[in-house]
Amino acid sequence: YMPKHQRRIIQKIPDFDILSEHPQDLCEDVVREITEHKYTGVKYTKHAGVGEVISEHYDIRVGDEVIAFLYKPLACHSYNTIRINGDSHANGETIRIATIDTMLSFYLAFIYADRIYYDINRILCMSQFLFDVQQHNRLKQTGLLRRFSINCYGKQATLESMRFEKTAKYEELKGKRGTREFEEWFLRYVPYENAGARARALVARRL
């Protein structure tokens, strides 16, 4: 769905965003496989999640270049399937590709995560391209463009499990009030309360 001149540019960017229930195990497998092909300086790094928006995740690097990010799913994310390297089940291989809605939800979360390893301009460009593809193919519900798929990867959190996780996280962070991690999990912002506080402060100054 991408014009040839744009496709040539993207092919030079060997970046992957991958969902895995066991991202650390997958990182170890990938690093071992790449190292066996005589590449050096291959390693992976773990990064903390961002509240309830982005889970704990890992990057895989060859030297200074990041080639993949791996995320543990926070919900059940929809995907479509395609076959490559053959048309039949005997000689082909099925791969899962996230739906455009799933990709956009992650990309927009990356923008607001404020992490130095995310290239905001690249993310915005890819988000715009995906949005345009979706707009131009609104009525096409086949292949990778199928928007609503019954297939999903990961486990959808229930209200009970979310409460349990938040309680456990509060016990872990209650001694770190004022830190960024605490605010990402428990920041409470109520606009009308803040407006009322500013109004009271203004009246007090005038008096």
Where are these regions (language model features)?
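Active-site nucleotide-donor binding segment shared across nucleotidyl transfer reactions
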Residues: 1-24
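Short, conserved charged micro-motifs
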Residues: 24-31
